[in-house]
């Protein structure tokens, strides 16, 4: 099996399509990506900070720096663009990943979106 389908993108438990920021040119919002196997139940969850350059600029007005891991930076809020970019990245990863191991594939996705098991180390007794 390989995670190969975006099942849902949501913001705070609500569908991305139902969310709209106060300022579409200056916002940041964590979205949850539910990624699973097409035609099967279940998903693995990843989090991604979607933000604009203007939001980053305003953060820099009050801070010396802004860290940038697990971010998708877009010019203005656009649900279709967000969905398209997330799907495009998943397809790019599917094309270069030849294995069939969901754990290893999740580690690849985690380079772009935070995965709850990222850096998890199993402790044997």
Map each language-model feature to its residues.
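C-terminal charged interaction modules
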Residues: 92-125
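Short helix/strand-capping turn motifs
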Residues: 1-102
């Amino acid at each position: 099996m390989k995670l190969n389908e975006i099942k849902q993108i949501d913001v705070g438990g609500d569908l991305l399509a139902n969310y709209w920021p106060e300022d579409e040119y200056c916002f940041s919002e964590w979205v949850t990506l539910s990624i699973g196997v097409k035609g099967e139940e279940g998903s693995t969850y990843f989090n991604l900070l979607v933000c604009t350059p203007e939001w980053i600029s305003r953060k820099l007005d009050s801070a010396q720096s802004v860290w940038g891991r697990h971010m998708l930076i877009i010019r203005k809020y656009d649900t279709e663009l967000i969905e398209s970019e997330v799907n495009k990245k998943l397809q790019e990863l599917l094309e270069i990943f030849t294995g069939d191991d969901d754990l290893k594939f999740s580690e690849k996705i985690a380079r772009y979106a935070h995965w709850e098991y990222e850096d998890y180390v199993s402790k044997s007794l």
